[in-house]
Each structure stands twice: as structure tokens, then as C-alpha cells.
Amino acid sequence: MLQVNVELKHHHYPIKIGQGLLTNPQSYAPLKAGDNVMIVSNPTIAQYYLATVRDTLITIGCKVDTVLLADGEQYKTFESLNQIFTALLENDHHRDTTLVALGGGVIGDVTGYAAASYQRGVRFIQIPTTLLAQIDSSIGGKTAINHPLGKNMIGAFYQPAAVIIDTQVLNTLAKRQVSAGLAEVIKYGVAFDSHFFEWLEQHIDQLMQLDPETLAHCIQRCCQLKAAIVAQDETEQGERALLNFGHTFGHSIEAHLGYGTWLHGESVAVGMLEAAELSKILGNLTEDQLARLEKLLANAVLPTTSPDGMTADQYLPYMWRDKKVLNGQLRLVLLKSFGQAYITTEATEQQILTAIQRFTQH
């Protein structure tokens, strides 16, 4: 078992990475005999892993209840949040309860926000079951639900007590979801670690085939990078915003199409290309670097052009609604070079449109 520790000012917790962790009672520390637990999952994940997790927790001596939410980004809503609160109240859960998020990013985000809010805060543990959740959304305490007018607009920073990453759960993950997770993996390389980007270029085929050792190394490196950034900037006042490379463009695609039409990682893939093209326009990246990024995304079976029918000017209203807008200025995460992300307000609207147009289908 590999472990990465997240060390924050007022909180620290382990990320445990390995095979067969769901059946190992030691993985679930700090849970112990007598603890009350509410597992939050969805029917897709529950059919594979709910019984395993529940039985292991019962073996530890926990009292376990479960609640299943509808599956998909379009259910990251007040209604799903309220469903968790209702289950907690109906089953008489108090402040000493622990929520366990068993699922992908949607389950993790909604469960985390429920944990932050229920009786002003209860403990929760992340068991991410998608690659994207394992390397990104389960780490760092960002919890949220969507609003019809914007993604992740209602939420809280609330850290888990532990993150349990069992790489075996990826064997039941749809190939499209594996690719979507690899978009965020590639983001870590291109934005923070050029050596890791080169390693990804060499190992993308093994990752697509879910080779266990390659996966474990990849997940560990992503977790190390994320943990280091979160430790510097827990509530996204500065450095942490760099993790949003490609996301301002990508969120525009998601919001325009309707959440859940394209997967988050698919939207981010195109968003990274558009941000990289803008970086090139501003005199930073080379055409060769842009081509390498495009090739790596294509090898991960990710889209490399905007959705059919979406024009460049349709991005702008969503981009202006982005949480990184400050004092009426659009703050974009761009690249000085591979591994060197930075934030700028210098790009003009015309430059942004030109960058997007390169990756729109005419």
C-alpha cells in the first residue's frame, strides 16, 4: 500500500493507494467499533462495491446505514443533498456520525457538502471509484453542488478524514470514464511537472490498459502534486487556482451542453488545448508543445475539438461567470511552458476567441 499525506494548517489526513483496500479493515482508520456510518453511493457503484464496503465496516463493528443517489452530474443538486439529510435524520444520525462517499466526483462532492452542513459538520471519508475522483476531486476538501446558472456555485471547503483509493475498482469503470480521468492526469503533467508529462507520453498505453503498477505510480504522483498545492493554498486564494488549467474553457462546454452531456474530463481536454493555444498566442508555448499535448489527449481517446455546433462566442458568457473573475477581470490559468502554469488577466477577448476558434469544428 502506498500512502500520501495531506498536511494542512489545521488538519492532516492520509491518502491510501493500493489493491484490495476495500476488503481490508485497516484501510478504514480512523473508523472503529461502535461508530455510526452512513454510506452514500449510487446504484451503478452499489451493485459492485456497496456490499463489500458495508460488510468490512460491519466487521470493524460499525453501525451502517446507506443512501443511494441518482447517478450523474445532472443530479449534483439541492434535491440530492436533501436526500442525504433526510436519510441521516430518519436513521437518527447525530454529530458523531461519519459519512462515507463511495463513488465518483459527484458522490464525493455532494457527500462532502452534506458532511460540512449536517449539524454544522460531521466527519467524512472519501472512497473514490473513478480515476478522475481518485487523482483530483476526492483530495483537498472542495465540496459543492451545481446551480442551473453555474457549476459548483454552492459549496464549502471541508476536508475528509481519509481518502481510500483501491485501484481494483477501476476494472469496472467504463473506458470513457477512464479517458475522462486521464484528462486530469495529463493536466498535472502539463501544468505542474514536465517530467511527469514525458512519463505520461511514454506510458499512456499501459494506463489505458489499467496496468496496476503503472496506475499506482500515476495516481501517487497526481496525489503528491495535488497535496502539495492544497497545503500551500487550502481555500484557493492563489496557488490552488492553477489546478483549474483548462477548466474555465471546459466549464463553458459543460454548461452550454447541459451538465452530464460531455464528461467533465472530456470538456477539460478541449479546454486545455484552448488554454494552450492562448498561451502560444501570448508568446509562451511553441507549436510543437501544443502538438504534443494534442497527441497525448488523442492517445487517451479524448476529444480535441469543441462540441458540434458550439461557436467561440458561446463560451464567453460562461467564462465571465467563472469563480476566478475578480474586479471585473477574467483571470485565466495559462502556461509559460510545460510544467509552469500561471494566472494572467492580460489576454484580450479577441485573443481568447481566436484560441477557441482553432479548436471549433467549422
Curated annotation (Swiss-Prot):
Listed EC numbers: 4.2.3.4
Single GO MF descriptor: metal ion binding
UniProt-annotated location(s): Cytoplasm
Record flagged with keyword Metal-binding: yes
Pfam annotation, one family: DHQS_C
Domain of life: Bacteria
InterPro entries assigned: Dehydroquinate_synthase, DHQ_synth_AroB, DHQ_synth_fam, DHQS/DOIS_N, DHQS_C
Record: residues binding NAD(+): 71-76, 105-109, 129-130, 142, 151
Chief subcellular location: cytoplasm
Annotated metabolic or biological route of this protein: Metabolic intermediate biosynthesis; chorismate biosynthesis; chorismate from D-erythrose 4-phosphate and phosphoenolpyruvate: step 2/7
Cofactor(s) listed: NAD(+); Co(2+); Zn(2+)
A GO biological-process term: chorismate biosynthetic process
GO cellular component: cytoplasm
Keywords in alphabetical order: Amino-acid biosynthesis, Aromatic amino acid biosynthesis, Cobalt, Cytoplasm, Lyase, Metal-binding, NAD, Nucleotide-binding, Zinc
Top enzyme class: lyase
Chain positions recorded as Zn(2+) binding sites: E184, H247, H264
Comment on bound cofactor: Binds 1 divalent metal cation per subunit. Can use either Co(2+) or Zn(2+).
Catalysed conversion reaction: 7-phospho-2-dehydro-3-deoxy-D-arabino-heptonate = 3-dehydroquinate + phosphate
Family: Belongs to the sugar phosphate cyclases superfamily. Dehydroquinate synthase family.
Biological role: Catalyzes the conversion of 3-deoxy-D-arabino-heptulosonate 7-phosphate (DAHP) to dehydroquinate (DHQ).
NCBIfam families (alphabetical): aroB
Name of protein: 3-dehydroquinate synthase
Lineage per the UniProt record: Bacteria, Pseudomonadati, Pseudomonadota, Gammaproteobacteria, Pasteurellales
